[in-house]
């Protein structure tokens, strides 16, 4: 669906701790107005478990030395760590005239389209948000909508240690197996995955102009 504003600002944040980026997302969402641009934040986090608003403590089996942060997104517990691409779409869905479910579908489809370039057959599930390959999960998804705008986003496993996922029931599903793109012949690095996902995401949502930035804007 074409957007009223066809410019998307891409912010390459590199490696950043989770909480500082989370608070920056909240600040951008709370202070943006009808003229504020849509942005896509691309980042890699140190090891952390994040527990969504629907999260149940019993799904954290053994956090060990990895911190657990309670956050304001939808969904259950997930893991972020080095070698995982994390993308936060900060989209004014009210201005863009797309619904929440449609945005979720677009995000999932952008991952599916990106993996298809590498001949990886991925798919979404109606009852379990995210993207899967052969019943193993390759990407997790959790959004929050506030003031008609989205924040939080997606995490794509690229080239990471998947062992910490065994310390939790990922997204609330006991025994859910995870997989990553490098093992499937997909993107080999977080940088490559970010570049390719930016293309499929912007194409799917109708953005025609991409403006790249290094780091966050000065607040």
Curated annotation (Swiss-Prot):
Site description Lowers pKa of active site Cys, residues in chain:
137
Concerning CDD domains, the annotation shows:
LipB
> Which residues carry out catalysis?
171 (acyl-thioester intermediate)
EC number per UniProt: 2.3.1.181
Q: Name one GO biological process term.
A: protein modification process
- Main localization (coarse): cytoplasm
Q: Which Gene3D superfamilies match?
A: Bira Bifunctional Protein, Domain 2
Q: Where in the cell is it found?
A: Cytoplasm
Enumerate the SUPFAM superfamilies for this protein.
Class II aaRS and biotin synthetases (SSF55681)
Q: Which UniProt keywords apply?
A: Acyltransferase, Cytoplasm, Transferase
Give a GO cellular-component term. Answer: cytoplasm
Q: Which GO terms describe its molecular function?
A: lipoyl(octanoyl) transferase activity
> Any other noteworthy remark?
In the reaction, the free carboxyl group of octanoic acid is attached via an amide linkage to the epsilon-amino group of a specific lysine residue of lipoyl domains of lipoate-dependent enzymes.
For this chain, the family text in UniProt reads: Belongs to the LipB family.
Protein's recorded name: Octanoyltransferase
Q: Look up and give the organism this protein is from.
A: Shewanella putrefaciens (strain CN-32 / ATCC BAA-453)
Upper lineage: Bacteria, Pseudomonadati, Pseudomonadota, Gammaproteobacteria, Alteromonadales
